[in-house]
């Protein structure tokens, strides 16, 4: 089985509040995005790693890191960025993993768990159990109901797809309100498997998240 990974690293990270996009900040000795690249590169079946970055970073990164991955140019939206990465995937690739560069703590074990499930079901997504009580709220600000937390999961990445399925999903126009890749496949009326991650895999969104990730990596 030959697999590819698309690392989405083209976001501006406005909520983080830094002049340098968070995925390129130094995190315990290496750029944030490189932690994810190395996690996928440690798995032999991943023959191709594509990092989608802002257009002004493509040449710089291609020269700085001449082996290990190739760069694709990011688009205006995440959908466009992943689609640009998808265009570089080889014809012999069986499964494609899409992963957020801002989740640098992803473990080899969790990648393999999601990949194993995807190999059986064609699509699998990393998830974590919802920890907080979740309320359904009306447009005018009133609580309609409390959702059953035991069946709620927070979607993470990687999200791993049979190649032809992801390409088919991305050949269609993105629907309004689509927030992740698996939703595109759901729109094809295809069941998506959920795999609970075993290790910390949070997304770096704030400076507090960054500091926590640094503490974990140094411990």
From Swiss-Prot:
Keywords: Isoprene biosynthesis, Nucleotidyltransferase, Transferase. The keyword Transferase applies. The keyword Transferase applies. Disulfide bonds: none annotated. Pathway: Isoprenoid biosynthesis; isopentenyl diphosphate biosynthesis via DXP pathway; isopentenyl diphosphate from 1-deoxy-D-xylulose 5-phosphate: step 2/6. It catalyses: 2-C-methyl-D-erythritol 4-phosphate + CTP + H(+) = 4-CDP-2-C-methyl-D-erythritol + diphosphate. The record marks 149, 203 as: Positions MEP for the nucleophilic attack. One of its GO terms (biological process) is isopentenyl diphosphate biosynthetic process, methylerythritol 4-phosphate pathway. It comes from the Bacteria. HAMAP family: IspD. Catalyzes the formation of 4-diphosphocytidyl-2-C-methyl-D-erythritol from CTP and 2-C-methyl-D-erythritol 4-phosphate (MEP). Belongs to the IspD/TarI cytidylyltransferase family. IspD subfamily. This is 2-C-methyl-D-erythritol 4-phosphate cytidylyltransferase. It comes from Endomicrobium trichonymphae.
